[in-house]
Structures are given as C-alpha cells and as structure tokens.
C-alpha cells in the first residue's frame, strides 16, 4: 500500500461519520471519581474535574464539536470551565474543537513541543487532508503549553505526568494521573497513539519523518511496561474497548474500566505489532 491508497481507504471508512456524526453519539458517563468519558464512538475524549477547573484530554473530530459540547452539558458541567485541553498528539482528529474552546473561553491548549514543531514545519503533518468534510478554513490550533518528555503538570488537585512515545507521531504523549473516589485512589494511564500505519515506510517518507521512528517507539513501549495503571484509557474506543466496557457496565454494573492487567496487555500486543512492521519493511536500526 502507498500513501494515496491509505488516504483513500481512510476517507472511505470515515465518510459516513463525517456526514452524520450524530449517529455516532453516546451518552457521556463517569469512569471513576472525577474522570468522565465525553467522546463518541469514533474518538475518545476524557474530562477530568480537577476541583479548580476542567481538563480535557483531546477534543475530537472537527465535524463533531457539537457532540462534545452537548456531552459536557449533560454531565452538569459548563464548557467555559475547561481550563486546559491536553492533546495526545498532532493529528486533526484529536484537536477538532480546540480552537472553539480557545476562542470562546480562553482555554489553554497543550501538546508536546515535538509535535508542535512538526505541525509548524509541515502543515500537512496534522493529516487535515484525511478529513472527508473538513472546511477549508479549518487550521490546527495554536498551543500555549508545550510539554517535554518526563514533565509533570498540576491543575487543581490533579498532577499529570507525561512521557514522550515517538511513533504514531514523533511527539505522542503517554499521560498518567491519579483519580480518587471516596478513600480509593487509582492510577489512570493513556498511550496517545497506537496506530502503526504512521510507522510504515510510505508514511515516513511522505512526511520526511526519520526511519528510526519504529525503533524509538519500540524502546519507549518496552519502558512503559514499568508503569502501573489501574484504569487504561484509549484515545480511540478500540484501544481499550471503551464501548464494550460501557455496555457491560450498563447491563451488569460494577466497573470494568478498573482492570490493572489491561495496560500490560496493550503494550505486549503493541510491541509485537511494531516488530512485525520492522520485519515487513526491512528496517535496520542504526
């Protein structure tokens, strides 16, 4: 497969969602304590009530802004109280509503410094051409907070820890933070980009990305196995079976999102898939 074939395949898959995003809406819900799901069936968006304003992790597709605003209202929150949006990486399907929040409410926007620099260097980096119905005037947002590898950032009573995981983009963020419900504190974790089309040779060469990226990703994925995670969050629902877990919760009760083996399972699977790409593409580590 080449880049153009992959682009056409993706646009075909996404065309129905872009025409009728309301068909992909789901009711927002609490995951644990101050952590909520406000995304849709195509992309994950998480809301954290920090006690001193709200934080969003990603803001979804540009054609589904209304679904996000509606979900925030339905939970009893106000979109104007979103202080910060943390972006897992620099692809268009994760910053769709961010400019709206910044312009209307003064929300600060955060992303890794690495991806911010790539977006500035090459506007195509954000894959806006992959959006079947993106308005021509739609541009990547400006970012006020640039995150470094290993950095901590505190908002209200929540401290977010960031690890850089180059691969899906050079500046993908893994995000870890504690959430409390009653006397119980759990660790939430999210790996902000697990799709591997972006580490195939055709994609790397299309955007002038280093061929070392698959090896960089493999090294960091292995290192992340040391992180303890009680609640594995996805940045697309398939990453952690968001929709299946919610359906199970509605039928059986309990909290299927709390499962400390999910994180290790994700990383084991991802490690194997990265090695498959390296072998398939005959990449050689320098």
Functional labels for PLM-detected ranges:
Residues 11-16, 24-25, 30-32, 54, 61-63, 81, 143, 152-154, ...:
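Metallo-beta-lactamase
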Residues 35, 63-66, 73-152, 251-252, ...:
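Active-site HxH/HxHxD metal-binding segment of metal-dependent hydrolases
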Residues 34, 48, 58, 68, ...:
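Divalent metal-coordination and catalytic microenvironments
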